[in-house]
């Protein structure tokens, strides 16, 4: 019997959310992306759109212009340079977009309730915890309860990658046959991945540690 498509996924076009979309594709009715003024938004969104179309999933892109206009973060077009080097708290703290996941999950909750969908998937993972407060289990748990209590149909948030690493995610993706050349990580948002910013370094390490050949085209 075919499973009911009762879920929404927040998908950026990066490795993690694309992997989750393929893993949960049997239940996903809607893929939701946000244009919030980040340096890499355009590159990410093109891949979010590609994979949604490939899976036959409706795809919405909702603009969140106010984030780029009023929030402070070097990840935004309005911010400073993207730091290079390792993906760790000290190096990447300038790229925190305040309460980004909270805002996106709130919008996703309203949309899920409007569509009669029962579940929201989000692909935060263990490696994000030290850097981004709204990727931690200590945020996801109460946000899940708030959304459940605040929606008439008791919408649930599911974040199945919260306690696993990006290497683990890469292995899942490989088992699903995902071509990671068709995903975007680089925060600089150029024509090619820069290869030296924190997210590029994390991407390289995850694929290497998973034993997966890196198909990414890097600058130089």
UniProtKB/Swiss-Prot annotation:
Signal peptide: none annotated. InterPro entries: QueC (IPR018317), Rossmann-like_a/b/a_fold (IPR014729). Keywords: ATP-binding, Ligase, Metal-binding, Nucleotide-binding, Queuosine biosynthesis, Zinc. Pfam families: QueC. Its EC number is 6.3.4.20. Pathway: Purine metabolism; 7-cyano-7-deazaguanine biosynthesis. It catalyses: 7-carboxy-7-deazaguanine + NH4(+) + ATP = 7-cyano-7-deazaguanine + ADP + phosphate + H2O + H(+). It is an enzyme of class 6 (ligase). Its cofactor is Zn(2+). Disulfide bonds: none annotated. It comes from the Bacteria. Zn(2+) binds at residues 186, 194, 197, 200. Binds 1 zinc ion per subunit. GO terms for molecular function: ATP binding; ligase activity, forming carbon-nitrogen bonds; zinc ion binding. GO terms for biological process: queuosine biosynthetic process. Belongs to the QueC family. Catalyzes the ATP-dependent conversion of 7-carboxy-7-deazaguanine (CDG) to 7-cyano-7-deazaguanine (preQ(0)). This is 7-cyano-7-deazaguanine synthase.
């Amino acid at each position: 019997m075919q499973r009911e498509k009762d879920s929404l996924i927040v998908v950026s076009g990066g490795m993690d959310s694309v992997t989750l979309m393929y893993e949960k594709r049997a239940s996903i009715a809607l893929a939701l992306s946000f244009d919030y003024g980040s340096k890499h938004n355009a590159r990410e969104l093109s891949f979010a759109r590609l994979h949604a179309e490939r899976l036959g999933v409706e795809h919405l892109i909702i603009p969140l212009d106010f984030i780029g206009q009023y929030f402070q973060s070097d990840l935004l077009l309005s911010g400073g340079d993207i730091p290079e080097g390792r993906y760790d708290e000290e190096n990447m703290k300038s790229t925190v977009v305040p309460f980004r996941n909270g805002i996106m999950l709130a919008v996703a909750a309203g949309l899920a309730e409007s569509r009669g969908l029962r579940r929201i998937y989000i692909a935060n993972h263990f490696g994000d915890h030290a850097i981004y407060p709204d990727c931690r289990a200590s945020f996801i748990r109460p946000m899940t309860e708030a959304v459940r209590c605040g929606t008439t149909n008791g919408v649930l948030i599911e974040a199945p990658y919260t306690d696993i690493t990006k290497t683990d995610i890469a292995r899942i993706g490989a088992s699903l046959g995902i071509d990671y050349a068709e995903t975007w990580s680089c925060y600089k948002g150029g024509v090619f991945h820069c290869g030296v910013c924190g997210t590029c370094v994390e991407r390289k390490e995850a694929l290497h540690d998973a034993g997966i050949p890196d198909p990414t085209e890097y600058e130089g």
